[in-house]
Design a protein with these regions (language model features):
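ALDH superfamily catalytic-core signature
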Residues: 1-96, 125, 159
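Conserved C-terminal structural/oligomerization subdomain of aldehyde/semialdehyde dehydrogenase
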Residues: 33, 79-82, 86-172
Length: 172
């Protein structure tokens, strides 16, 4: 549900692979099942409360970009979940760099998708937020990954992985 502080909410993709990546991302997002967390087939449960649901929904509605998918309540919720605070996973694009969704933590199933042309632009975009708890760098070029890890301003940075960690390690 994007309600942990290590969730990535800004997806930066090299422009040369953006069309293929976007197609695969949207297909994977469409396959996610939102619903009853007690059911094994559910990928995303509800948001924590009505005020939080309204905050996330308002952030989506106020975003000056394009909603590629999601943004609403799922239509196929089981009866026992109909009054819950469920939200479809949402991906937005065409956002200005200075909008709230690019600069603030939303803590919901919301992500922005943005292209970058080269490594310096990727680095600039990655560091263009006061929130830098975690980041993930995905690339076939390990030299590039190590260069970026040295310059991205984040406390935890994964290379070609996410949420792989030792829970005994100090954090925060």
């Amino acid at each position: 549900t994007g309600q942990i502080c290590l969730c990535g909410s800004r997806i930066l993709v090299q422009s040369s692979v953006l069309p293929e990546f976007q197609e695969k991302l949207l297909a994977a997002t469409a396959a996610m099942r939102v619903g009853d967390p007690a059911e094994e087939t559910t990928h995303i449960g509800s948001l924590v409360s009505e005020p939080h649901y309204l905050k996330v929904k308002q952030a989506i509605e106020a975003a000056p970009g394009t909603v590629l998918c999601g943004g609403g309540r799922p239509n196929n919720l089981p009866d026992r979940c109909r009054d819950g605070w469920f939200l479809e996973p949402t991906i937005l694009t065409d956002l200005p760099e200075s909008c709230a969704l690019e600069e603030e933590e939303v803590f919901g199933p919301v992500a922005s998708l943005r292209a970058f042309s080269d490594e310096p632009e990727a680095l600039r975009l990655a560091n263009a937020t006061p929130y830098g708890l975690a980041a993930s760098v995905w690339t076939k070029d390990l030299d590039r990954a190590h260069r970026l890890v040295q310059r991205v301003e984040a406390g935890v940075i994964w290379i070609n992985a996410w949420m792989v960690r030792d829970l005994r390690t100090p954090f925060g």
